A protein has these predicted regions:
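Membrane-embedded alpha-helical bundles of multi-pass transporters/translocases
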Residues: 2-487
């Protein structure tokens, strides 16, 4: 284990206004802004590529697979670049957001340019590849600093819970707005044909709204914890520190299970209500649960964290969610109403962890500094983001494989009639996957994740003392945070 003092850096808490509602609301707008880009691309880019630009599903699939691989490594690279960048007067992370939001939003608009459909296929493919890859890289350049910034806004465990909760609210709001509003504007005529021109202008509006949200984040939040570095931490030493941080390794494994569950469950729910229950209205209700549970749980997250701890609350919630899905698996109900009720409670169990996941990451960042003496917000966040993208790629491939394995019949005519055996297998997958994933995540938290309530509080106290020791005062009596930094 390393010493808790490192000569190459100095971390302090600057003199600034106390953590307040401005920080919470400002941080929330950051993820609303992210979803004006990320959710628009995730939800609508494929249909734009296939129905407007005329690309085949195979061409789009190969593009997404290559880009996802590049994106995952971009997260780690950007995290390291951010950590080693100059400290500005507004902090280390906000300048990155301020600069990189512009190329991100420009590339977002370029993704949906309709005139590309008139170009030759090879030119179309090159343009699509360059713009999608560019969008992914610049999204990392905004999202990694944004996510890392939470640990720099406050070191107080309760404040971190608030930031995580407001970020989850922002994500839910941003996803809901883009998912349910955009389809109202992109179709024309009685046949509801997709309009490439309308698509383009809707995305331009989303880019403008995303810019406004990012600006609110930049101007409303304050980076209070700042690290001044005189030298870069060697990569070998950085990797060693990552492996010493057991909390990071375990959180990565837990996050992989949660993300796989989210992606596979979302896919299977669509097939379940389409083929097993044959109820499209119920499908819409089920898909809303992802947003609704976050909003319902948000008012209670801080109380539960203060009373029991982040780890402790999440273990109970995940086990509760797993139990609800397990009951559905065993009962094998044909009642849509009963399924929706149990699904709602199961979603509450998974939703509590999703509310707190960003606070878990800030706990891990603080733990990394306590263990190694080195504060690496960006790279720690980037490693976790890398794991989430790998999990998304696994879920994407595994979902298609499972449908083929159980004998699901595809169709070009609106949907083939599935056999009784196949639809019951769909039910088993829709309930069995979350039962297993949530149970494994809960057990990893219970037996291997070291940051319980007591440890988190102790780490916060140690870092507060260390940062106070590091505070350098000029002869005039001004605090280190008042000295001139890079503009």
């Amino acid at each position: 284990m390393w010493s808790t003092l490192d000569k190459t850096q100095k971390t302090v808490t600057i003199d600034a206004a106390p953590f307040n509602i401005k920080d919470k609301v400002g941080y929330m707008f950051g993820d609303i802004g992210n979803n004006f880009s990320f959710n628009v691309v995730n939800s609508f880019l494929m249909i734009f590529y296939t129905n407007v630009l005329g690309l085949t599903g195979a061409q789009v699939g190969i593009l997404f697979l290559i880009a996802r691989f590049v994106d995952a490594f971009a997260d780690i690279t950007v995290g390291r670049l951010v950590d080693n960048s100059k400290l500005h007067k507004s902090g280390r992370f906000k300048p990155w957001m301020s600069r990189m939001q512009y190329p991100l939003l420009i590339f977002l608009v370029l993704l949906f340019v309709p005139v590309v459909k008139d170009w030759a296929l090879p030119v179309r493919l090159v343009f699509v590849f360059i713009t999608y890859l560019g969008w992914g890289i610049f999204y990392s350049c905004v999202n990694i600093p944004y996510g890392s910034m939470a640990a720099a806004i406050s070191s107080d465990p309760n404040d971190k819970t608030s930031l995580s909760t407001f970020r989850a609210l922002g994500s839910a709001l941003g996803s809901a707005i883009t998912s349910y509003i955009i389809p109202l504007f992109i179709y024309i005529g009685a046949t509801q044909k997709i309009s490439g021109t309308r698509f383009f202008w809707v995305v331009v509006v989303c880019a403008f709204l995303g810019w406004g949200c990012y600006e609110l984040t930049i101007h409303l939040t304050t980076e209070r914890i700042r690290t001044e570095k005189s030298a870069k931490v060697p990569l070998s030493r950085l990797v060693q520190g990552m492996f010493e941080n057991k909390a990071l390794i375990v959180l990565v494994l837990i996050d992989i299970m949660i993300v796989i569950n989210q992606n596979l469950s979302g896919t299977m729910i669509s097939y379940l209500f389409n083929d097993y229950f044959k109820d499209k209205a119920a499908m819409s209700i089920a898909l809303i649960f992802n947003f609704a549970t976050v909003i319902l749980l948000a008012p209670f997250s801080n109380f539960l964290t203060k009373r029991f701890g982040r780890k402790e609350t999440s273990i109970v919630a995940l086990l509760f969610g797993a139990l609800m899905y397990c009951i559905l698996l065993v009962v094998h109900t044909q009642s849509t109403s009963f399924y929706l009720i149990m699904l709602f409670f199961g979603s509450l169990g998974a939703g509590m962890f999703n509310l707190m996941v960003w606070a878990f990451i800030t706990d891990v960042i603080d733990n990394h500094e306590v263990l190694t003496g080195v504060r690496e917000d960006g790279i720690v966040y980037g490693v976790n983001s890398f794991a989430r993208k790998v999990a998304q790629a696994i879920a994407g491939g595994f979902g298609g494989f499972m449908l083929t394995f159980i004998g699901y019949q595809s169709s070009t005519g609106g949907g083939a009639e599935q056999s009784v055996t196949v639809i019951h297998r769909i039910y088993n997958l829709a309930t069995g996957i979350p039962t297993v994933c949530l149970s494994v995540a809960a057990l990893l938290l219970l037996f291997f994740y070291p940051l319980n309530k007591k440890r988190v509080t102790e780490n916060a106290r140690k870092l507060e003392e260390l940062h106070e020791e590091n505070r350098v005062r000029k002869p005039s009596g001004k605090a280190w945070g008042s000295t001139k930094l890079a503009g």
